[in-house]
Amino acid sequence: YARAIKETFGTDFNVLFGPAYKGIPLTVAATMSISEMYDADIRYCSNRKEVKDHGDKGILLGSPIKDGDKVVIIEDVTTAGTSIEETLPIIKAQGDVDVLGLVVSVDRMERGKGTKSALKEISEKYGFKTTAIVTMADVVEHLYNKPYKGKVIIDDTLKAAIDAYYEQYGAEE
């Protein structure tokens, strides 16, 4: 994540935001890595699915988001953009902030609501950058007809099924 974030956004931001639940450990780990690898002072913030009224109260974990912050969102995958639609109002409710974009680990390369990929639709709808560390095409290429511990993970039969799936549901770009 740290390298993908740096390559896409530099270090000209100050908050990484990870939507609950998977985004919480991703955000903490990425923030630590960016700090260590690039000597950048980046804070992290995540939301909870439900507000707590004890301990660390509220809907947010980590550093508060405040006016003037520049935020990058990180997630594991994005399929239809639903999580972003839920996340942006939470971030924007914290103050006058600039959401710079979204980094995901895997671009599933599936259509969003139209024929474009969900990541492309998100980028166009919200006017910010989106990037993925790897695509499903990268994963398939890496595993196709290559043995792992004596077994081929993606053989010709599975590759044909994957190709058929993407023919029907894959983004057209």
Residue ranges and their predicted role:
Residues 3, 32-36, 89, 93:
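Short, well-ordered alpha-helices that flank and scaffold nucleotide-derived cofactor binding pockets
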Residues 60-111:
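A contiguous pocket-lining binding segment that forms or flanks enzyme active sites
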Residues 9, 32, 173:
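Nucleotide/phosphate-binding catalytic cleft detector across ATP-hydrolyzing
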Residues 11-22:
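Short glycine-rich phosphate-binding loop at a beta-alpha junction
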Residues 28-71, 82-85:
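Short, glycine/charge-rich flexible loops or terminal/linker lids adjacent to PRPP-binding catalytic cores
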Residues 93-173:
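PRPP-dependent phosphoribosyltransferase catalytic core
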Residues 1-10:
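Active-site-facing substrate-recognition patch
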Residues 16-17, 45, 100, 131:
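Structural detector of well-ordered beta-strand residues that form the stable sheet scaffold
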